[in-house]
Swiss-Prot record:
This is 3-isopropylmalate dehydratase small subunit. It holds the Pfam family Aconitase_C. Heterodimer of LeuC and LeuD. InterPro entries: Aconitase/3IPM_dehydase_swvl, AconitaseA/IPMdHydase_ssu_swvl, IPMI_Swivel, LeuD, LeuD/DmdB_bac, LeuD_type2/HacB/DmdB. Pathway: Amino-acid biosynthesis; L-leucine biosynthesis; L-leucine from 3-methyl-2-oxobutanoate: step 2/4. The lineage of its organism: Bacteria, Pseudomonadati, Campylobacterota, Epsilonproteobacteria, Nautiliales. The keyword tRNA processing does not apply.
Amino acid sequence: MNVITGRVWKFGDNIDTDLIIPARYLNTSDPHELAKHVMEDADPEFPSKVRPGDIIVAGYNFGSGSSREHAPIALKAAGVAAVIAKSFARIFYRNSFNMGLPIFELLESDEINEGDLIKIDLDNGIIHNVDTGKDYKFTPIPEFMQELIAAGGLINFAKEMLKENK
């Protein structure tokens, strides 16, 4: 069973790419440098307190704004294991999978609280809130998208495919 388990960081609606990684830090593409500033304009303590495996839960329109790949790169480098939101900007959705960051749409995201421990069952499409005992259903990620995540993103996936075809 393919499961992601982590503690929740809670954010609201319309978290755009400038809040995820402010434009003033786009002079680098080093993931570790970006991670030092991820979400700092939304929560100044986030970069120092986020831990590997943590999960962001947000409202509508997560990742709107400019189509920078820096946003999912920064989240992933900071240790964020997944993002759950009511909806995502389409370009952020695609960029996240291309970078190997799993994201999930869940209209009931406001029922999950900051600090809750949740388990995301990728195979069965279930988010289980360990603290409340409540389960939420989502449409499972297509197999190809799961392969992108498992490979660490589109570039790594393509490299693996090239190795297999030699």
